Amino acid sequence: GGTPPKPFGMGMGIGSVTLDGVLFNQLALRPEINIGKIGIGLDLVVYMDNEGNMRDDEWDIENDPGLLLDKILFIRYGKKTDPVWVKYGSIEGLTLGYGGLMNNYSNMMEFPSVRRVGVNTGFNIGPVGGELFLSNIKDMSRGGTVTGLRAAYTVSDDLPLSIGVNFITDANMFSGLKDKDGDSYPDVFDDFPDDSTLWNDTDGDGWPDPGHGGSVLDSLVDIDADGDNIIDAEENIADINLKATPFSLKDNKASTTGLSFDIGYPVLQSDAISLMIYAEYNTLKFPAVSTSDSSFIRKERSGSGISVPGIRSTLFGILSLSLEYRMINGSYIPQFFDQAYDLNRVVTSTVDNQTIIRTKDMSVFQDYNDSTSSSGLFGSAGLNLFNLVEFSASYANMKADTTELKS
């Protein structure tokens, strides 16, 4: 179904970006080449500073052939209605089911300073469809990434009622913390974020503490690591106050899982107009987490949401409308895995010189408990003019047990 993609398309991006603390003007050409079922998207970008000097790092392919991979934005085979399809690289606008767990997710929110490499693949065999999604395979070595699965069954052509189940897990929300040198100590805790052999510098003088292992020369180690102006060799070990080993991605995990069931029926389906009615049941679970040094403590939370009835309609491929009645219990919000999920999956702040880590659930549900409940109408409208201009608006009128929330 549908028209085949054009053999060639071109996207363009102009803006400014900060790389390694320096502001650059950015010109990006993003050609898309389609041959049969294969599509390749490229990212050809030039960065110039305010004096007009081009940054060479991205084009030093002779010394770093791996840079060629950075030029590939995505590789795609087939489309989502084909018997088998797969996409590798950038993932945008990903929704599982009716979006109660994941809606409009993108792994490109911090591009190009953070390049995530995702996988989205699936199949359609007769009445059965399946889909698998990984947000960033680079996170696999850092304790885990966001993984999504969907299975759907359509009763028949005469009765196109579809039943679906969705499962999403973020195996380690902490892997959203940046760790440039890959030593498992996030940059925010790492006194040497660009050197994988070093991490602690208690007195902040640029010389590492002892205890970094045999790969660090003795001549590099700080002779007064705690900065009290007494050489450590002449001091009792008990009097040398050094930082503890920093928070590590290897030893600490904070996960979340979501499970949902949905049922939908297309009342109308044509190029001009579509109308779908549906119902969806979603759950979210956040296991309790306590790190060995108690630097991070998260209480267990869970919640659920039911959307029934739900109605979605599109007109001429330009206007999209949705309306649903939602009933929410406990620590659940619709679209927990949303477009900005990678930005707020885990956040850090500094309080009294201490770095505090909070996973998204701790920020979103800090005023909730598992007996909180609300219900009400949610509606949204979107306008898309020829894929050039997009507008969207939403309305919610949710009545809680005690208060009324309008947005």
Question: Which sequence ranges carry the predicted segments?
Answer:
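Extracellular calcium-associated, cysteine-rich motifs in secreted modular proteins
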Residues: L177-I240
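Extended hydrophobic-aromatic, low-complexity segments
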Residues: D201, L321-S322, I333-P334, V389-A393, ...
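Non-catalytic interaction/regulatory modules that flank or connect domains
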Residues: L315, S373, G382-S407
